[in-house]
A protein has these predicted regions:
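C-terminal beta-strand-rich structural cap/linker in extracellular carbohydrate-active enzymes
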Residues: 151-183
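Active-site rim elements
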Residues: 1-2, 42-52, 162-167
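Short Gly/Pro-enriched turn/cap motifs at secondary-structure boundaries
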Residues: 2-5, 14, 84-87, 166-168
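Carbohydrate-binding surface patches
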Residues: 85-124, 174-179
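Glycan-recognition and catalytic regions of carbohydrate-active enzymes
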Residues: 9-10, 16-19, 23-26, 30-106
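C-terminal accessory region downstream of the catalytic core in glycan-modifying enzymes
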Residues: 41, 46-54, 61-63, 121-152
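Conserved small/polar residues in nucleotide/adenosyl-binding loops
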Residues: 184-191
């Protein structure tokens, strides 16, 4: 399970990371053999359960990329990217924000170890509510189905360089995306 989970986590991390995307043919379904220009792909792999699940994960990642401007706008400057967690070598978890031209953000959290973190504390630059919008550990992608199925409110509790923080569920060998709504935005719609 670790091989496919690690691959899905890597694809999720790569899709959210700044820069243009490249995936050689066959990678979208977990092809084992390096790409060969003079031979066809091993399509029979799609008969096995794990390969179509990786394919579904890649399909969903492509849909998210096409419909989430934060993943492709401001792709060439620090204005569209902010490290949230880059120093947790004990847990091998990294997190960053991608922001579009309108200020909408997507939080990407990747766990590069097979250790489940049901309550991982993460610092954030603003007060708001996080909602999980993608998780490579979902059952339909071949994962263990550990996910955040509730809205997560940040608290005014400092963590590292951030004034706010919250606890999130971080599955093993997985990448999770969150969208956020700031409290000021929520208040504007409540009145």
């Amino acid at each position: 399970w670790k091989k496919f989970a690690g691959l899905r986590a890597l694809y999720g991390y790569t899709m959210a990371h700044p820069g243009k995307k490249l995936l050689f043919m066959g990678g979208e379904f977990g092809h084992f053999i390096e790409w060969k220009y003079d031979d066809q792909l091993d399509w029979f792999l799609l008969l096995y359960e794990n390969h179509p699940q990786v394919q579904q994960c890649c399909k969903r990642l492509n849909e998210i990329y096409r419909t989430t401007p934060a993943l492709y706008q401001i792709d060439d400057s620090w204005d569209g990217f902010q490290w949230i967690q880059a120093n947790d070598s004990d847990n091998s978890i990294v997190a960053f924000l991608r922001t579009d031209k309108r200020g909408n953000s997507l939080l990407c959290v990747t766990n590069f170890t097979p250790v489940f973190h049901p309550q991982y504390r993460i610092g954030l630059p603003q007060m708001g509510t996080l909602t999980e919008c993608f998780n490579t550990d979902r059952k339909e992608y071949g994962g263990s189905n550990q996910y955040n199925n509730w809205a997560i409110r940040t608290e005014e509790e400092q963590l590292q360089d951030f004034q706010y923080s919250c606890d999130i569920c971080v599955p093993p060998l997985a990448t999770v995306y969150f969208t956020s709504v700031s409290y000021t935005h929520l208040r504007a719609h409540e009145t």
